[in-house]
Curated annotation (Swiss-Prot):
Known role: N-acetylglutamate synthase involved in arginine biosynthesis.
Name the record gives this protein: Amino-acid acetyltransferase, mitochondrial
PANTHER family: AMINO-ACID ACETYLTRANSFERASE, MITOCHONDRIAL, N-ACETYLGLUTAMATE SYNTHASE
Enzyme Commission (EC) number: 2.3.1.1
Top enzyme category: transferase
Region (Disordered): 213-233
Length: 621
C-alpha cells in the first residue's frame, strides 16, 4: 500500500503544476508576439556611421581647386622658417669649455630633448586646424529630425569645423510663463542628440550677448546698413572659449543682458548677428596662437573667426520667383538683396515665414565675416549639404545652369539649399569710354596669362562693342561684341572675352557673371531676366550668343553644360546658346517633330557663324 501524501503537499504540487502551465503559456505567447512584432533593430554600428561620413564627403565631389581651398583653411598651417636675421651673431668667439661628465640628471635632460615632438609628427597627430561656424537651429524638430541635424554637425566637427549653436523654437511663444524653462529644455535636447552622435556638447544657458547696438557702431555703419541689435565684449566670450578649448560644442539660448543686467529673451537672429561681430573682433584682437619654436602647435587652437553661417530650418532656402517658387541656388547679396525683397511673393510669408529675416541675418553676418565666408540656408532633410558646402563652398547645383536642365532632371527640389555670399556689384557699360582700360587690361592678362595687344583690342571694340559686364572693381568681366555676318541682316552676338581674376575663381563670381550675361543676351525677354544688374532689366528680345574656345581649354566642360550646342573646328570649339524666348514659342513644334526637326532660321547658320568667327583677329601679342 502506497502512503498518501498529506493535503498540504498535494496543494503545493497543484500550484506548481499551474505555475508551470502559466510560464509555458507566457513563453508561448512571448514567442508568438515576437513573431508578430519584431524586436527593435540594434543601434547603428560605428562602422556604418563612418561609411555614411565617407559617402557624404564623396557626394560633395570636390574639384582640385576645392580641395586646395579646404586644405588652405583647415590643413596644417605653414610656419615661417627661421633666418639668420632673427639672431644676433656673437662678435667674439670664445673657445668652448671642456665637455662635462655625463651624470644621471644630464642624461635625463638629453633624453627629454631627444624625444621632443617634431613638426612632422605634430602635423600627423593634429592634421586639422579647427575653425568655427555659427549655426542657427530653427525648431521645433522631432527627435528623428534633430538626430539628422546633429549627425551632420558632428561630421563637420570631424572635418575641422566646430559649430557654435544658437537654438530657436517656434513652439515656444514669446511671453510664455515658462518660456525660459522650455527654451532650456530645447537646448538640452540638442545637447543630448549631439552626445548621442558621439560628440561632446556643453549647454550655455546664461546670456552671452548684450542688448542694444555696440556704443559707437552707429557712427561707423555704412549707408543703408544697420548694426546688430546686440553686441559683445571680449570677456563675454569666455564660456564659448572654454567650451571650444575643452573640445565641446557650445549650445546657446537666445538670451541677452539688458541695461539692468537681466537675462531676457531676444530673437535668435539678433543673438547670432551680435556673436558674428563680436567673434570677429575678438579674433582680430587675439589672433590664432602662433606655433612654438619647435614647429609644433597647440592641439586646442581654434580660430574664433566664423567661416560659415548655417541656418537649419524646416523649409530650406529662399524661394525665387524666377524658379516658380523653388529656392534660389546662389545669392549675390550686394546685387540681389533689394530685388529679392521686392519680388518676394506674399504667399511665401506663410510657407517660408523666416526666409526674409534669415536673408537679412546672412547679409549682416557676412559683412563682418571674411570675404571667403558664406552662409547656407538648408532644410533638416539635407544634412549632407553642410559637408558639401564646407568642402566646396559652392551651391548644391550651379545657378548658371539652364533652367530646363535644372528642373528637367529633378536636380532642383523644394528643399534644395540656398548659398549666400557677400558678392560683388554687377554693372553693364555700353561704351568703350566708360571702361577703365588699365584695370581691364590687368584683369584680362592675369586671367589668360598672356600679354594683351591693347591698341588693336580696344580699337576693335570701338567699332564692334555691344556691352561689357563688370563684376566688382574689375574682378571679372564679360565682353560681348556685334560681329557683321555676310548674308545676314542681323549681326552675330559674340562673347569676345569672359574672364575672372584668379583670386576670385571658385568664390561664385563666375556664376554671378554668367547669370548677368544670360539676362542681358540670350535670356533677355523672360520675366526672370529682370535682374538689377544695370542692364536692360529683362526688357527686349533675346539673341543667340556665340563664342569660341580652344579645344584643349579645361573650361570647355563648363561651357558644354551651359551651351545649347557646339561645333568642333580644328583647334577651336564653337559654342552657342539659343535665345530662350524664341525657343519657348517653338517648344511645341520641336517636341512633336522629334530630334531631326530644323527651323527655317537654323538652316546654314552654323556655317555662317564658323566663317565669321574664324576671321576675328587675335587680341594677344
Amino acid at each position: 500500500m502506497i502512503p498518501r501524501a498529506p493535503p498540504s503537499t498535494q496543494l503545493f504540487s497543484a500550484k506548481t503544476a499551474v505555475n508551470q502551465r502559466s510560464q509555458t503559456f507566457k513563453a508561448f505567447y512571448a514567442t508568438i508576439r515576437s513573431l508578430r512584432q519584431p524586436p527593435p533593430e540594434p543601434p547603428e554600428s560605428p562602422q556604418a556611421a563612418d561609411n555614411d561620413f565617407i559617402l557624404s564627403i564623396l557626394k560633395a565631389n570636390p574639384s582640385l581647386r576645392d580641395t586646395r581651398s579646404y586644405l588652405a583653411s583647415f590643413g596644417v598651417q605653414p610656419q615661417r622658417p627661421k633666418t639668420l636675421e632673427d639672431k644676433k651673431l656673437p662678435e667674439i668667439v670664445i673657445p668652448p669649455p671642456p665637455a662635462p661628465k655625463l651624470t644621471a640628471s644630464s642624461t635625463k635632460v638629453v633624453k627629454e630633448e631627444k624625444h621632443a615632438p617634431s613638426p612632422v609628427i605634430n602635423s600627423i597627430l593634429n592634421p586639422i586646424y579647427r575653425r568655427t561656424a555659427l549655426v542657427k537651429i530653427q525648431g521645433p524638430f522631432t527627435d528623428v529630425q534633430l538626430d539628422s541635424i546633429t549627425r551632420g554637425l558632428v561630421y563637420l566637427e570631424k572635418l575641422g569645423m566646430v559649430s557654435v549653436i544658437v537654438v530657436e523654437s517656434d513652439g515656444v511663444p514669446k511671453g510664455e510663463q515658462e518660456e525660459r524653462k522650455l527654451l532650456i529644455d530645447e537646448i538640452m535636447r540638442v545637447v543630448t542628440s549631439l552626445e548621442k552622435q558621439g560628440a561632446h556638447a556643453r549647454p550655455i544657458v546664461g546670456a552671452v550677448v548684450r542688448l542694444g547696438p555696440k556704443p559707437g557702431s552707429e557712427e561707423e555703419s555704412e549707408p543703408g546698413f544697420s548694426p546688430p541689435e546686440t553686441h559683445i565684449y571680449p570677456s563675454d566670450l569666455t564660456p564659448i572659449r572654454s567650451s571650444l578649448r575643452a573640445g565641446e560644442i557650445p549650445v546657446l539660448a537666445p538670451f541677452a543682458l539688458d541695461s539692468r543686467c537681466r537675462s531676457v529673451r531676444v530673437d535668435a537672429n539678433d543673438a547670432i548677428a551680435g556673436l558674428a561681430c563680436g567673434m570677429v573682433e575678438a579674433a582680430s584682437e587675439n589672433p590664432s596662437p602662433a606655433a612654438h619654436e619647435d614647429g609644433s602647435s597647440d592641439s586646442d587652437a581654434i580660430d574664433l573667426t566664423p567661416l560659415r553661417l548655417m541656418i537649419i530650418n524646416q523649409r530650406g532656402g529662399v524661394p525665387s520667383y524666377a524658379r516658380s517658387g523653388y529656392p534660389h541656388l546662389l545669392i549675390n547679396l550686394q546685387q540681389e538683396y533689394d530685388h529679392i525683397l521686392q519680388t518676394f511673393d506674399p504667399r511665401w510669408k506663410d510657407s517660408h515665414p523666416h526666409a526674409l529675416s534669415d536673408l537679412a541675418l546672412a547679409r549682416t553676418c557676412l559683412r563682418y565675416m571674411p570675404p571667403t565666408s558664406s552662409a547656407i540656408m538648408v532644410s533638416h532633410k539635407s544634412p549632407s549639404s553642410l559637408i558639401g558646402n564646407l568642402i566646396t563652398n559652392k551651391p548644391a547645383v550651379s545657378s548658371s545652369l539652364p533652367h530646363a536642365l535644372l528642373q528637367g532632371n529633378l536636380r532642383l527640389t523644394p528643399h534644395t539649399p540656398t548659398l549666400l555670399r557677400r558678392g560683388l556689384p554687377i554693372r553693364v557699360v555700353r561704351s568703350v569710354s566708360d571702361i577703365d582700360k588699365e584695370k581691364m587690361t590687368a584683369l584680362l592678362e592675369q586671367s589668360f596669362g598672356r600679354v594683351l595687344d591693347q591698341e588693336a583690342f580696344y580699337g576693335r571694340l570701338e567699332k564692334t562693342l555691344d556691352f561689357v559686364i563688370i563684376a566688382g572693381d574689375y574682378d571679372g568681366t564679360a565682353i560681348v561684341t556685334n560681329e557683321v555676318c555676310p548674308g545676314s541682316s542681323q549681326p552675330i552676338s559674340y562673347l569676345d572675352k569672359f574672364a575672372v581674376l584668379p583670386s576670385h575663381q571658385g568664390d561664385g563670381t563666375v556664376d554671378f557673371l554668367w547669370v548677368a550675361l544670360h539676362d542681358e543676351s540670350y535670356g533677355l525677354g523672360h520675366p526672370f531676366s529682370a535682374n538689377p544688374n544695370g542692364g536692360k532689366g529683362g526688357k527686349g528680345e533675346g539673341r543667340d550668343l556665340v563664342w569660341r574656345s580652344r579645344s584643349n581649354n579645361p573650361v570647355n566642360k563648363w561651357y558644354f553644360e551651359r551651351s545649347t550646342g557646339h561645333l568642333r573646328m580644328g583647334q577651336w570649339v564653337l559654342f552657342w546658346a539659343d535665345a530662350e524666348k524664341r525657343l519657348k514659342v517653338e517648344e511645341s513644334l520641336r517636341g512633336s517633330a522629334g530630334l531631326s526637326f530644323i527651323e527655317d532660321w537654323e538652316h546654314g547658320r552654323l556655317g555662317k557663324w564658323a566663317d565669321t568667327i574664324t576671321k576675328i583677329p587675335s587680341s594677344w601679342k
